[in-house]
Amino acid sequence: MMSKLGVLLTICLLLFPLTAVPLDGDQPADRPAERMQDDISSENHPMFDAIRGCCMPLSCMLLCEPCCG
């Protein structure tokens, strides 16, 4: 009985391998560079001043880059 089950499992894996399953292209794991860029962007920091193009002087201590001093 176990050998028949093993043969059936082997045939199923040969006919439909697990790598043939299509992956969702919208997964963030598929694009790690974009995900990292979005996470560390200083423009998205709440202390970033878009008009001046830099962070407020006190936010340098809060790891907001670039600082204008």
From Swiss-Prot:
Question: Which keywords, in A-to-Z order, does the entry hold?
Answer: Amidation, Disulfide bond, Ion channel impairing toxin, Neurotoxin, Secreted, Signal, Toxin, Voltage-gated sodium channel impairing toxin
List the lineage, top down: Eukaryota, Metazoa, Spiralia, Lophotrochozoa, Mollusca
Q: Give the signal sequence positions.
A: 1-20
Provide the free-text tissue specificity comment from this protein's UniProt record. Answer: Expressed by the venom duct.
Presence of keyword Secreted: yes
Q: Which family does it belong to?
A: Belongs to the conotoxin M family.
Which residue numbers fall in the propeptide?
21-52
Pfam families with a match to the protein in the record? Conotoxin
Q: Which residues cross the membrane?
A: none
Top-rank taxon: Eukaryota
- Identify this protein by name: Mu-conotoxin-like Am3.3
- Cysteine amide sites (modified residues): 68
Can you quote a single GO CC term?
extracellular region
Describe how it is modified after translation: Is not hydroxylated. Contains 3 disulfide bonds.
